[in-house]
Amino acid sequence: MSDLDEESQIETQIDAPIEDIIRGSELTTTTADKETLKSANELLDSLEHSHRVDLSLHLYSAYLLKRLLYKANEKKHFYEVNQFVKTQIKDNWTSWPNPNTIIDPSVDKLYEDIPEGIANVSVQPGEISNRALMHASDMMRVELDAQWQKFLSKSALDHDVTLDVDELNIPNEISRNILVKLDSLFEGLHDKIAKENEFDVRQDKHSNNIRANQIDDEPMQANRRIKYTYHDLVSRGCEMNEDMTDIYMKSLELYNDIPEKYKKRKFRLPKQILKKYHQPKKTSSYLKELLSKTREDFIPVEKLLKDKRLTSKDKSKLQRLNREETEDALNKRTFFQVKGYLEDENEISDYELDDCLIELPNGNI
């Protein structure tokens, strides 16, 4: 076959309809190719199943979706994308587990036969009984045992050592130390946002006895506006004198580096969707007039957001500005906290043993 015939054959194949090319490729599919496709589909199903049952991956995917939606649309349509996220991707959208697909472990409940004669202790809504806490602690110890056995088995396999099955559980001292640190971590996080309980302390004029009365003994309602970030965890770890460098660097990768790798155009909302979330009516901005009339040198953004005279567009701009300033301040604070811990660890004391010695004067005292 001449070169001219080969070129004409190639051109004929290129000009052929795509349907004919696909149909021809299907005819040449071998049994090995089918097995490969079957294995690939099984692998994808397995990955999708692990994605559905992995809590951390589920929450991080939800965070990425919100972050990238804002990043791709907030420059020109901040109000619209903000309303879209609030109405379509609510906080309960990321709740876990999904009762329709995953069984709730219910660590706050304990099912057992109660002997007759013991009264059932009622628990207030939002409270957890001591028995439920003990049950949750036992489940935590089981998880710690599993992780401990995993690392021991890996180390034994690498060094060709046989382990005693009865000695694979994590020592009580280590597990107790881990639980104490977790209690301290959560207690510190709770103290940052908890409402302080007030007491009225008075002294009786006749008996000189001191009486303490609780001012507000009504049940507290959960504040759903409070949200924790990795800054709170890293900050609390530094307060506990823990080395949070690795966690801090990993957090920067998850929440700063990885979102920047995605292309924004893939997450831009169509105009048909954005039109549904336009402002109800166009009104003139009152923000400049409000700022010009005030006598204060500094006005908190939170105070401006509560002003009913501002339009939705003005409030959206202030919310975006407040979010950016808050994130920047939190990033700086967390960085200096981690850096301060490292400086304390590497700091060499200026005092030596000779500084503790006192030189006595010569002669008789």
From Swiss-Prot:
GO biological process, one term: nucleolar large rRNA transcription by RNA polymerase I
Highest taxon of source: Eukaryota
Pfam name, any one: RRN9
One Gene Ontology CC term in the entry: nucleus
Main location per the UniProt record: nucleus
Cellular compartments annotated: Nucleus, Nucleolus
Transmembrane feature ranges: none
Gene Ontology MF: a single term: RNA polymerase I general transcription initiation factor activity
Alphabetical UniProt keywords: Nucleus, Transcription, Transcription regulation
Cross-referenced InterPro entries: Rrn9_dom
Similarity remark: Belongs to the RRN9 family.
Subunit structure: Component of the UAF (upstream activation factor) complex which consists of UAF30, RRN5, RRN9, RRN10, and histones H3 and H4. Interacts with SPT15 and RRN7.
Biological role stated in the UniProt entry: Component of the UAF (upstream activation factor) complex which interacts with the upstream element of the RNA polymerase I promoter and forms a stable preinitiation complex. Together with SPT15/TBP UAF seems to stimulate basal transcription to a fully activated level.
Protein name: RNA polymerase I-specific transcription initiation factor RRN9
Organism (species): Saccharomyces cerevisiae (strain ATCC 204508 / S288c)
